[in-house]
Design a protein with these regions (language model features):
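Structural alpha/beta surface segment adjacent to cysteine/selenocysteine redox centers
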Residues: 145-233, 263-268, 293-303
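Residue-level preference for short coil/turn positions at secondary-structure junctions
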Residues: 78, 138-140, 189, 269
Length: 303
């Protein structure tokens, strides 16, 4: 679904298609945020301008709506970064485009790190900021960090491949960081429960995550507390204590810090993996051999 909507977004913007009537999704205020390499000197377009631009691009497609999630300076000096949530019958996708300093051109694509060691900035940020449950040797030459959302179908689909990758790689340490997406109505609650389970028992955490993904389609916003409490109990911790912990301000602070860490390294969707700082943003279970190659290459580079 992520790749489908992203492809539609790129094709429509790149093709310059325009104009018919639709009703955009209700807009959220722009949320400027600092991150590594951000240039605060960029001239930011207004939400009204961005909305008009999107209306001209997508207005003819009645089943496609959008919500402006953020407008802020990009990592590249002079470029403004616009984050938009696109919604269609296929689902929702968080995506970005960039506005040139002249305010008359937009760039569609991904800004990637460049340099002799392009992945070191993200690697260093993650090494300092990761707090999630982990598996594998502490001194492993490779650290794989997953930013995940327990309500995310793509995360559920990716888990068997990620599990196999971690199990087969003695060179890898694996860390899970909560990154609940606003578009999912019980994801934040799931992250709070997961945070509490992880602090209570590292072993129970992995059982909790596995069972939550397994029963994901049975959980709703209305039943989340009941279901997640039972899953926590089944994972080997006291469900009632976890439910109480999930409501504590400290827990929300932990989850918010994990989200902030993800945003600092440019996480925009889930699952997103980092292999020693190298971003793998579109996880495809069919590419297991490629991911193994990335881990092995990172291990050699770390020597």
């Amino acid at each position: 679904m992520r790749s489908y909507l992203k492809s539609i977004f790129i094709l429509l913007l790149a093709g310059g298609l325009a104009a018919a009537q639709t009703t955009p999704a209700e807009q959220a205020p722009a949320k400027p945020a600092a991150k590594l390499g951000t240039h605060a000197t960029a001239d930011l377009p207004s939400e009204a301008t961005v909305d008009s631009f999107l209306h001209q691009q997508f207005g003819y497609q009645a089943d496609l709506t959008w919500k402006i999630s953020g407008i802020r300076p990009s990592p590249v000096e002079g470029l403004a970064e616009v984050t938009v949530v696109l919604a269609s019958p296929q689902g929702q996708q968080l995506t970005k485009f960039y506005v040139a300093p002249d305010g008359k051109h937009a760039l569609v694509g991904e800004i990637i790190p460049f340099g002799a060691k392009p992945f070191d900035p993200a690697k260093n940020l993650l090494e300092k900021g990761i707090t999630g449950p982990e598996r594998g040797p502490k001194n492993a030459p490779v650290t794989i960090v997953e930013f995940g959302d327990l309500q995310c179908p793509a995360c559920k689909a990716a888990q068997p491949t990620i599990e196999a990758l971690v199990a087969a790689e003695p060179n890898a340490r694996f860390v899970f960081q909560n990154f609940p997406l606003e578009m999912h109505n019980w994801a934040a609650k799931g992250a709070a429960y997961a945070d509490c389970v992880g602090r209570a028992s590292n072993d129970a955490f992995w059982k909790f995550v596995s069972k939550t993904y397994e029963t994901q389609s049975d959980i709703t916003a209305e039943t989340a507390d009941e279901k997640l409490t039972a899953i926590a109990e089944g994972a080997g911790v006291k469900g009632a204590e976890i439910a109480a912990c999930a409501l504590e301000p400290e827990t929300k602070a932990h989850v918010d810090a994990s989200i902030a860490l993800g945003k600092s390294v440019d996480v925009t969707g889930t699952p997103t993996l980092y292999i020693n700082g190298r971003k793998v943003g579109s996880f495809d279970p069919r590419m297991t051999d490629v991911y193994k190659g990335l881990v092995e290459f990172a291990a050699k580079q770390a020597k």
